[in-house]
């Protein structure tokens, strides 16, 4: 409110997020050196907070064990939406309008793979508008479903025609992949590597992006990719063990992080 008096406490969330980012990463004033700042609601009455933010207050209290009515909240912008998406096609009729029922509608460049809603690219700009995700989900969902039925009806083969060896080969691939992961006996902790990657991306490729920092980030991601080869699979048991799957996902995260950067 001091920096943007015309907005009062109604400053847009993207502006507020950039200010929090500046406090944490440029001014180095995050709480205890961590990426978080205080949101003080203690001056508001408990009835007011329960009425306006009841659900959020309850969730925060369960996760932190602290009551925002008495102790300032610790907050930081969270990633919950990825701008951009898969390229998708469409077919126009003679009037230039969408030809409903066409198998090309919302089809990606991979035959048989369709994308709609937040997974495709068409409704994204420099900043996300809250209702656009719902709009795109409804519109592309309605348009895509009829096209999928048309695509399936026009297929020459069904899943029953696929050789069983195809599934056997896929199963063998993943069995060998996880066997390889379980055999990783290096020095790097995968969970620490994941944290390091997250810190780099949050600091340089989240809210504020600068070319120089992006170039530095690519170098750091390449370094993490090198460190990945020296991972230690800290749990090699077969039953109810999420570690090998996490390590496999971490590899994909590293690749995706570089693409995004």
Regions found by a protein language model. Name each.
Residues 122-148:
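A conserved FAD-binding loop/helix module that cradles the flavin
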């Amino acid at each position: 409110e001091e920096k943007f008096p015309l907005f009062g406490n109604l400053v847009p969330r993207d502006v507020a997020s950039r200010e929090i980012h500046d406090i944490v990463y440029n001014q180095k004033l995050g709480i205890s050196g961590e990426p978080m700042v205080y949101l003080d609601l203690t001056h508001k009455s408990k009835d007011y907070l329960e009425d306006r933010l009841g659900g959020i207050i309850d969730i925060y209290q369960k996760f932190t064990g602290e009551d925002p009515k008495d102790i300032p909240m610790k907050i930081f912008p969270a990633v919950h939406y990825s701008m951009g998406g898969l390229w998708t096609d469409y077919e126009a009729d003679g009037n230039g309008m969408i030809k409903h029922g066409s198998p090309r509608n919302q089809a990606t460049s991979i035959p048989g793979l369709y994308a709609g809603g937040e997974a495709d690219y068409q409704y994204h700009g420099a900043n996300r508008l809250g209702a656009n995700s719902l709009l795109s989900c409804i519109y592309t969902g309605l348009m895509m479903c009829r096209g999928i039925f048309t695509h399936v009806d026009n297929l020459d083969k069904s899943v029953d025609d696929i050789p069983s060896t195809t599934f056997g080969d896929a199963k063998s691939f993943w069995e060998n992949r996880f066997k390889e992961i379980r055999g990783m006996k290096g020095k790097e902790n995968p969970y620490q590597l994941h944290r390091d990657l997250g810190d780099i991306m949050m600091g340089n490729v989240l809210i504020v992006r600068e070319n120089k920092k992006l170039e530095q980030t690519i170098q750091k991601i390449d370094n993490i990719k090198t460190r990945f080869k020296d991972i230690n699979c800290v749990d090699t048991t077969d039953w109810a063990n999420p570690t090998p799957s996490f390590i496999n996902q971490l590899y994909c995260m590293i690749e995706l992080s570089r693409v995004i950067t």
